[in-house]
Amino acid sequence: MSHAVEKIAVFFETLTPQSIERFSQFYTEDAYFKDPFNEVRGIPAIQRIFRHMYETLDEPHFVVTGRVVEGEQVLLTWDFHFRFRNFKSNELQTIRGATHLRLAHDGRIRSHRDYWDAAEELYEKLPVVGGLMRWLKQRANR
């Protein structure tokens, strides 16, 4: 399985809009995907999520920072770098997160679940919403 995990990590680190078409090499047909905004099943639905990423963000890319493999289960930690396309700030953004994968016997992904803090890692960086989120966080910590 470690060879399959290495291929998966390299695939995500080198992901492009064109390589999304190769998802069937890495996901089973009925693969499950969940992140803070989406919960879908099947390659076409997963491809739509990644296409949307490229349509709405500039320079999105993943850097895998760690991996733990236990049988068919994999935990990848990563940094996701991007620039907001529709905001004045052109500053490079980073979201830190983790992905729990469950692999099929052939090494393809049958379950992909992303974990990251949408409030801290995304909402707090948005104009208007970010100020509100930071204020709410301060109030909650009093």
Question: What positions do the PLM features span?
Answer:
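Short acidic-aromatic low-complexity motifs
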Residues: S2-F26
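A generic structural signal for ordered secondary structure
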Residues: V10-F11, F23, F50, Q93-T99
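Soluble or luminal CAZymes and related metallo-dependent hydrolases
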Residues: H3, K7, A45, Q93
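Short, mixed-charge, low-aromatic patches
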Residues: M1-V10, D35-P36, Y54-D58, R110
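A solvent-exposed, acidic/Ser-Thr-rich amphipathic alpha-helical stretch
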Residues: E21-R22, T28-Q73
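Short, charged low-complexity linear motifs
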Residues: K7-T14, P36, V64, G97
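A beta-strand edge to alpha-helix "cap/lid" segment located at domain peripheries
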Residues: E55-H61, T65-R142
